[in-house]
Structure formats: structure tokens, C-alpha cells
């Protein structure tokens, strides 16, 4: 996906598991936060000032639009009460700012999340951030995210990948 809301973690569906994990933390349970509360795509826990984008776009009539960090959430996409919930000392924004390599280490005891992240690492994308908008990835990086998504699926023994590298 090329939308500003799509990123490697959401594309691989690893973010669904991360949101579930955060919703299971004691503070989240006490506040009644569901996995949806940890989504920047839905109302609830996202910053409503920027609608979870982390930025505000100022349209300029005769010049290029100006994009600035949201003053309400300081570019963190979520409300402060959501950012107070942590897993192993990190909040949801910290996780989105981790590289794949950092996240593989951080989630070493979460096999479902780890399996999806390891595939990104295996296709050479350990350096990208989990929350990096897909629109900022190169064409080759986006292709590798798509490949990783397919490789992360359960092996049926009936899949053939044909990779063509035109010159």
C-alpha cells in the first residue's frame, strides 16, 4: 500500500498482534483499552487533531503544501493516555519507531510477532522502521515487503515464486 497509513508492520499484519499485546497490559485492561485503541487508523486512542497521521498539512495556494508535526501529539499519532501504556518499558510509538532489527530483539518472546518480523529481516529489510510509511519506501523495498508478506504465510507446499529482474 502507498497510503500514508500503510507501513511494514500493518502490511504484514504484525501490528495487529502488537496492538493485541499492548491491550493485554495491566494499565490497558484497567482503562478498558481494546486493540483498536492502539490503532492510528481508528477513533479512540489516536490523536484526533491529526487523525493519527502525526502531521498536519498546511495547503499553500501557489506553493507546495507544508507538512508540520502535529502540535497536539508532537508527531506521536496517539493520545497521551495510550502512550502511557508500556510493554517492556516501550510505548506503542516507541515500537513503531524501532527498526525491524530492534523489534526482532524486543519481541524475542512473542513468537507470532517474531515470525512475521524475522521474514522482513530475512529479505534484507532489517534497517527500516516498523512504522515507516510505505509511501517513503523505494519500489524495491515495497516489493520486498510484499514478498515477506507472502513468505510469512503458512507453507502449503504448493507455492511457486517467479522473480523477474528486467534490465
Model-derived regions, located:
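Conserved phosphate-binding elements of NTP-dependent enzyme cores
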Residues: 1-167
Amino acid at each position: 500500500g502507498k497510503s500514508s497509513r500503510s507501513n511494514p508492520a500493518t502490511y504484514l499484519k504484525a501490528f495487529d498482534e502488537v496492538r493485541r499485546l499492548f491491550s493485554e497490559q495491566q494499565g490497558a485492561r484497567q482503562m478498558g483499552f481494546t486493540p483498536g485503541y492502539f490503532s492510528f487508523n481508528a477513533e479512540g486512542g489516536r490523536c484526533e487533531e491529526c487523525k493519527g497521521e502525526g502531521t498536519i498539512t498546511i495547503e499553500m495556494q501557489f506553493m507546495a503544501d507544508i507538512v508540520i508535526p502535529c502540535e497536539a501529539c508532537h508527531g506521536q499519532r496517539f493520545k497521551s493516555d495510550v502512550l502511557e501504556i508500556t510493554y517492556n518499558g516501550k510505548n506503542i510509538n516507541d515500537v513503531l519507531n524501532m527498526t525491524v532489527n530492534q523489534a526482532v530483539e524486543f519481541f524475542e518472546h512473542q513468537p507470532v510477532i517474531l515470525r512475521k518480523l524475522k521474514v522482513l529481516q530475512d529479505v534484507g529489510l532489517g534497517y527500516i522502521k516498523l512504522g515507516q510509511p510505505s509511501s517513503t519506501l523505494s519500489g524495491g523495498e515495497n516489493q520486498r515487503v510484499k514478498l515477506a508478506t507472502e513468505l510469512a504465510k503458512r507453507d502449503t507446499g504448493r507455492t511457486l515464486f517467479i522473480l523477474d529482474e528486467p534490465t
